[in-house]
Amino acid sequence: NKSRKRRNRLSFLGAATVEPPKPIPLTWKTEKPVWVNQWPLPKQKLEALHLLANEQLEKGHIEPSFSPWNSPVFVIQKKSGKWRMLTDLRAVNAVIQPMGPLQPGLPSPAMIPKDWPLIIIDLKDCFFTIPLAEQDCEKFAFTIPAINNKEPATRFQWKVLPQGMLNSPTICQTFVGRALQPVREKFSDCYIIHYIDDILCAAETRDKLIDCYTFLQAEVANAGLAIASDKIQTSTPFHYLGMQIENRKIKQQKIEIRKDTLKTLNDFQKLLGDINWIRPTLGIPTYAMSNLFSILRGDSDLNSKRILTPEATKEIKLVEEKIQSAQINRIDPLAPLQLLIFATAHSPTGIIIQNTDLVEWSFLPHSTVKTFTLYLDQIATLIGQTRLRIIKLCGNDPDKIVVPLTKEQVRQAFINSGAWQIGLANFVGIIDNHYPKTKIFQFLKLTTWILPKITRREPLENALTVFTDGSSNGKAAYTGPKERVIKTPYQSAQRAELVAVITVLQDFDQPINIISDSAYVVQATRDVETALIKYSMDDQLNQLFNLLQQTVRKRNFPFYITHIRAHTNLPGPLTKANEQADLLVSSALIKAQELHALTHVNAAGLKNKFDVTWKQAKDIVQHCTQCQILHLPTQEAGVNPRGLCPNALWQMDVTHVPSFGRLSYVHVTVDTYSHFIWATCQTGESTSHVKKHLLSCFAVMGVPEKIKTDNGPGYCSKAFQKFLSQWKISHTTGIPYNSQGQAIVERTNRTLKTQLVKQKEGGDSKECTTPQMQLNLALYTLNFLNIYRNQTTTSAEQHLTGKKNSPHEGKLIWWKDNKNKTWEIGKVITWGRGFACVSPGENQLPVWIPTRHLKFYNEPIGDAKKRASTEMVTPVTWMDNPIEIYVNDSVWVPGPIDDRCPAKPEEEGMMINISIGYRYPPICLGRAPGCLMPAVQNWLVEVPTVSPISRFTYHMVSGMSLRPRVNYLQDFSYQRSLKFRPKGKPCPKEIPKESKNTEVLVWEECVANSAVILQNNEFGTIIDWAPRGQFYHNCSGQTQSCPSAQVSPAVDSDLTESLDKHKHKKLQSFYPWEWGEKGISTPRPKIVSPVSGPEHPELWRLTVASHHIRIWSGNQTLETRDCKPFYTIDLNSSLTVPLQSCVKPPYMLVVGNIVIKPDSQTITCENCRLLTCIDSTFNWQHRILLVRAREGVWIPVSMDRPWEASPSVHILTEVLKGVLNRSKRFIFTLIAVIMGLIAVTATAAVAGVALHSSVQSVNFVNDWQKNSTRLWNSQSSIDQKLANQINDLRQTVIWMGDRLMSLEHRFQLQCDWNTSDFCITPQIYNESEHHWDMVRRHLQGREDNLTLDISKLKEQIFEASKAHLNLVPGTEAIAGVADGLANLNPVTWVKTIGSTTIINLILILVCLFCLLLVCRCTQQLRRDSDHRERAMMTMAVLSKRKGGNVGKSKRDQIVTVSV
């Protein structure tokens, strides 16, 4: 009765009314209808098609259609005699967006636990039970034609998934997978495999299996699917996915391989593909199928003929035997898996076992990517491949890996083999070399060549040393204890050298050290002993490599081989011995060197006269110090090489002029030095036409040294090469299908065609009737009449005389080395439009440089000569050490604290324009490419409570931090690519108790579980390992579906909305809320690509100050709703903390529209501000760039003292106000001071203008320098005549004291003329009291009162002068000022500040005239005031004595103003 009940339950298929499944819409690349005409069908097939269509119509699978889409339909007859209808959907599939595969491979039945009972079912007409989306049905219409079109065709469209549609398998898998999902959730301890429409269920007991199957039946029926009752399997043997499954064993189903159909490459390709598919079950090693794989070699045409060789027939027989006998085992879910690696012939073999039961085989491909693949590398590759397979099968790494290596060999492999390190990366199991004792693996054919036995990696002691060499003439030789020359059939120097090494290994039966000048041969010989040699289409190379491997393996004594550079002319016995080997294969080398030393003949002449290779000839010329400047320079990126003299380099091409008729093939040649053009019209472009054209060119232009052409057949033929060799002409070609290498002649083609059109359409010469006459007229115009840009002579004159005017020839220049990314100094050889040829220095080849990579070299002037060439301001990059950023809060934010920040940071800053370069990616914050974007980040303190309602009390901190580009990096491949995990303790799972105090947060330096990417683009990759927490639903233990997406309780990360607008957050869910990441840690971003730099834990303090930090407090409560627990989190903003972040000198913040250009590695910013601090008033529409000033330079950020528009007018006005009668001695001293002050204030005014608008550039300073001496000498004479008339300067003393505060800091306009076009003037901002303040207070309000305390005034002036300024006699001061102002040009300053200064200059002249009149009047007042004269004389004596004393000090010198 019990068994009858089970049978009844198994036969139950369900009869409940079900809802149709919801269709999945398709995505289309285009909505334009696709119509493919239906082809005619025979009457028999047409009748069958009508019957099948009516059948499908009755079942509701199709419906009548009037769709504008159409696909052909046809029928085929099965072996049973039934007909099957198929639709050709290739055209429709082409416009469907693919969904992608959901199951990229077959599931392995070996993972089914052993002895578990099984049930296997097949879904009936699965595709036809799944509906199409209504809007997609019309796309799958088809037409049933009528014979002779005697009636309208019948049209239908599919309502269900049609067979052959691109996404039908994916949609089918999705529908079936949805139907099985409740079964998987309810019976999670059962093992269910689903592939397309085949379903396998396994359970530990029979009863549980019946329960699972019954539930599965109902779910499948509810989903609208039907089970094929005749395909239910309930007893062994089971057949599933081509396998025969028993209680413990799994075998391949019996199949027969037909050999009579194996005739073409396509046939064998399909056969080997099928065999490879089942090899993991059969266990056929790669070496056992080598002959079958060899049949695939040769012609790649799929229809090319292939023959089944006897050896390959034996291997097919082996496959058939394995199909009959091979078996694998189902696993024990409680036992661990192991991986065994066997050192089989050809390549290693891997076996996955459990105890002694075989689970699966693993093999490497027969063909490799590299020419030589070391056996140890193959083992490592197989380990990595099989580890991934095991993880895919069961989700875990193997517990043990057994390898054919000793413990010491494994240790050495970890040290020396990169492939081994990759294959065993992150493996934590056991690595062993003891294989299990079983006979199932004994049939494997093992090899002993795993690690090198004969080849050594270090030189051998007390061994012979042999030098080898080979030549392209076929000679191979070695020298050492004896010499030998071998004649080989090879025309390759490397193959001849390979023969020399093989001969040495055969001739010397003892330990030897081999030295070769071929790096290729050295590397091949080192690796060949244990390597798998890749098959090559070159039979000669295959023979050589196989002979080399056999020779090495047959040796009884070890050898060592190394590489030496040839033709280096270095001293020492190794170089001499290698030259001796060279002489054995090329005795002409010495003669070529002697001839070049005598005549300096070029490389082409040496190659033609002597039997030397091109490399040897070029080496001789390049090592000659006399020839390097005349040798054709090497090519730089972006520049077409040009000749340095006439006929050094030609470019030649063929263009077409259709109007010439039969002679439309115009052959054009241009000399790249003079741009002289010659062209001939031919009837074709074959080699004979090219030679005819060149002979014409030789008659007109001469014979060139080198010609560059494209890869046309006329230029690449042997006849053309022979023709060039007869004329001793070198020939090169450009990159195929890329005309940029022929840019000069391509542009010449366009110029010539344009000239022909001009002369034909607008010329008056009617006598030029033939094509050659028209061509000659155009060439005469271009060569003898036209003068091109940047030239002063015609192309013909340049070609005949060899003289080319270059305005920059011989000048020093800065040129950029793109390889090293550095700027170097060189000398210009020639200069053209967009290019230049530069000589880097002695014994170096010239290089061609595009003009965008050139800068003029300017001799440093003034104090700049003594300074290093570094920019005034440099950006702080990710490779620099982290800087300190100070905050004004020590409770909520960690870091250095400084409360002395400016009270109003928004008022600081100067407007500047800046343009600087960088080497490594700069640190930039804001919305811009290359800048890190700020965003909101949350940190949480979680305090458990004892309340039955409230589960937790949360104290959360929200603030600005750095936005990740993506969320958590769960991608395994990327985690492996990081190759490191920062050192440091992981973030704690629970917050320390002391951090639960909401008044103080304990910030820790901890590492999160995974990194986030802050930036990943052309500027580099920036990552951060700081924890980033979010609330999420805890769905663990739930049986129903539960959303698991993380939800952020904080404000939106859009920075356009202020944090202050959010006061409350509420989160509700039927599931408890959990915090995703514990720990309170600051972000620590670092660059990992293209370079790896240090961490920068300080940057986030700049972002956190841009908005208030917010403190949230709240509880998570638990209540009951609908008989279910309901969780609510209420968070309220309880506190906001304003912050201010600052940097300190020499660091600054450049704020504005910063643009970073990675191609030129420059940073530009117009109208930016210089800041030291930011706070919540900062607008993130701007960007922040961290910069560092040059050492010893202070950049002004606060200058609340405005500059006068015209300092000279102000000085003279002050002088006129306080003209008094004074001693002439004291006047001279004050004159010197005034002149110095005029110069200083002029310099300061110009510096202020430069600081505000960045007007100063290199040209500006050069202009200034040229005219400075003449202008200032003239100005000095005028000022001196004026100064002789001044008697007293009472108010000027006060004004002088004010200016001395600035003068003591020695204004300097510090620029680097060769590396930067931007100047910033340093000025120290200091509000401390100055000594001259006392003098000012003593004299203020005394304009009309002459009763001064002269003694006290003298004492104050003396103390102030002694502390700040040394007054010396006037003549010395004038000379010192004139010398210090040698590089100051006020004319350029006048031009810069515009018409306002012109008016000021006019006012100065007027004031000077008025001053002369006043001075005349004051001379009359001297006789009326004797007591005043005596007072002034006293001051003069004081000044003289003071000046003399100070002048003796070597430390204190005259007033200098440096520019």
Curated annotation (Swiss-Prot):
Keywords: DNA integration, DNA recombination, DNA-binding, Endonuclease, ERV, Hydrolase, Metal-binding, Multifunctional enzyme, Nuclease, Nucleotidyltransferase, RNA-directed DNA polymerase, Transferase, Transposable element, Zinc, Zinc-finger. Residues 811-859 bind DNA. Signal peptide: none annotated. A motif (YXDD) lies at residues 195-198. Residues 460-590 form the RNase H type-1 domain. GO terms for biological process: DNA integration; DNA recombination; DNA synthesis involved in DNA repair; DNA-templated DNA replication. PROSITE patterns: INTEGRASE, INTEGRASE_DBD, RNASE_H_1, RT_POL, ZF_INTEGRASE. Zn(2+) binds at residues 596, 600, 624, 627. Residues 57-245 form the Reverse transcriptase domain. Its EC number is 2.7.7.49, 3.1.26.4. Mg(2+) 2 binds at residues 469, 582. Residues 642-803 form the Integrase catalytic domain. GO terms for molecular function: DNA binding; RNA stem-loop binding; RNA-directed DNA polymerase activity; RNA-DNA hybrid ribonuclease activity; structural molecule activity; zinc ion binding. Belongs to the beta type-B retroviral polymerase family. HERV class-II K(HML-2) pol subfamily. The LPQG and YXDD motifs are catalytically important and conserved among many retroviruses. This is Endogenous retrovirus group K member 7 Pol protein. It comes from Homo sapiens (Human). The gene is ERVK-7.
